Amino acid sequence: MAVLIFLGCLLGGIAIGLPIAWALLLCGAALMFWLDMFDVQIMAQTLVNGADSFSLLAIPFFVLAGEIMNAGGLSKRIVDLPMKLVGHKPGGLGYVGVLAAMIMASLSGSAVADTAAVAALLVPMMRSANYPVNRAAGLIASGGIIAPIIPPSIPFIIFGVSSGLSISKLFMAGIAPGMMMGATLMLTWWWQASRLNLPRQQKATMQEIWHSFVSGIWALFLPVIIIGGFRSGLFTPTEAGAVAAFYALFVATVIYREMTFATLWHVLIGAAKTTSVVMFLVASAQVSAWLITIAELPMMVSDLLQPLVDSPRLLFIVIMVAILIVGMVMDLTPTVLILTPVLMPLVKEAGIDPIYFGVMFIINCSIGLITPPIGNVLNVISGVAKLKFDDAVRGVFPYVLVLYSLLVVFVFIPDLIILPLKWIN
């Protein structure tokens, strides 16, 4: 009955146009009535406690760092260096898009922000160069979803808080699969570019490459600081977020001198709006997660899947399919917040490496961001590239196919994720 109440309120709320956060609060209130324990004060306190976490403080810092990068000239310099290096290759702008997305991923941690920033810079150039815009936009959208995988990752922070796992370990575990996703996309683009006979950009001189490198090195140094700090134990994810925001602000104002006080004010407003949306969603989900636990929903799921516990691989496949289905119709953050407390006890009972599970969870949900019928990143790329949603779906289809194929490879060869983490540590 608890499952029906929760799903009914969630789907009903979404159907009438409620934001996900309010739909989750509705679910929480309905479960409290059903459990005969409704109390506004308890709900309010749980809501506050849901966002009262030092680890979650990393989110506004990384959001702010991403906003400063876009407004302060860091993003365009990050795109310019790959442009000078590989832009002259056949279909070179596609490689630039993936490389820029991977570098941006190591700075922003948000798929939507990453996709919007890279697409705004590259899609007009691709259109002018007579690239098939839907295919090019699909590639950039697919590159954008690497942002939740390569550290610093906002979804990893949320997953770590929800599951009690080390956020630093999750960050380190995301490096190798994120790079593999990027390599897979570039290989797919190489195959397509060879068939489409795409034009080349003018080859940059060594002087132009050097100038681009010198100009962009301040921006490129940021992921070195973040990952180096994690690796050395110099700072926590929250402290890393503060360092990233301060460093980005320093570079934008002192080095590049493209950040005015008026621009900074708009950046702070934008970061505050984004942070408020994410944190309210986290807090609302915490209310539902707490009541789901009281209603013993995790135990029900555990009992349902108990016969598969002795076969961890089969159990893991079933869980991945379930996450895939949910991720296709729901955004990444609420999927993580709702399913993590339900699935994590079962994962631990089956002896599945929880860090590996966390990485696979986020990869699966990230691909869902470019998978119809919802596809939030697809909506972003459609708007930026001025494409119909159907055209964006056709453009992204081959990349979705290869990314899900890579996900299957990760399922059957977990060492591709686990071993690089051991090497890094």
UniProtKB/Swiss-Prot annotation:
Segments passing through the bilayer: 3-23, 54-74, 93-113, 139-159, 170-190, 209-229, 235-255, 277-297, 314-334, 355-375, 399-419
Entry keywords, A to Z: Cell inner membrane, Cell membrane, Membrane, Transmembrane, Transmembrane helix, Transport
InterPro entries named in the record: DctM (IPR010656), TRAP_DctM (IPR004681)
GO molecular function per UniProt: carbohydrate transmembrane transporter activity
Gene Ontology CC entries for this record: membrane; plasma membrane; tripartite ATP-independent periplasmic transporter complex
Nucleus in keyword set: no
Chief location of this protein within or outside the cell: membrane
Superkingdom of origin: Bacteria
Biological process annotations from GO: carbohydrate transmembrane transport; cellular response to salt; regulation of single-species biofilm formation
Membrane topology: Multi-pass membrane protein
Locations listed in the record: Cell inner membrane
Function statement: Part of the tripartite ATP-independent periplasmic (TRAP) transport system YiaMNO involved in the uptake of 2,3-diketo-L-gulonate.
Quaternary context: The complex comprises the extracytoplasmic solute receptor protein YiaO, and the two transmembrane proteins YiaM and YiaN.
Record-stated family: Belongs to the TRAP transporter large permease family.
Official protein name in the record: 2,3-diketo-L-gulonate TRAP transporter large permease protein YiaN
